Amino acid sequence: MMKKFVAAGVLAVSSMLASQWGMAATLEYDMRTLAIGYKTFSGSDNAQQATAALTKMRAAALDSKKQAPAKVQKDPQQLKAYYAGVDQLVGEIDKTNALVKAGKLAQAKQEGKKLLDIRDTNHKKFR
């Protein structure tokens, strides 16, 4: 009886830890996807490549809203600010992508530099 109780407790704790680890890995993956996407976008020499990179970045940014950093999850104000930062990033990605689609790749790359500013600002707040 005692062995079953201990085994159940270990299983429950393991499940909780695995769940938290899985969420962190997903958020880390989204952030890595954003970084790789930006590098691809900034080095692109055609609209198709730039649009593909920005599209992947947008999807990763939206996915990152599904799981906030652990320290942010505990504070409703911080969580609201985190979501606002992600929304700002998505808005800037959309603005940059609109320039690419309008055939203004050079201007889009200049506008896209704001993505780094948004990243840096939000990393200071939430990392």
Region locations from a protein language model:
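Mature extracytoplasmic or organellar-lumen-exposed domains after removal of signal/transit peptides
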Residues: 24-127
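Enrichment for repetitive, rod-forming helical segments
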Residues: 10-11, 126
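Bacterial N-terminal signal peptides that target proteins for export
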Residues: 1-10
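N-terminal signal peptide c-region/cleavage motif recognized by signal peptidases
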Residues: 17-19
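Cleavable N-terminal signal peptides
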Residues: 11-12, 22
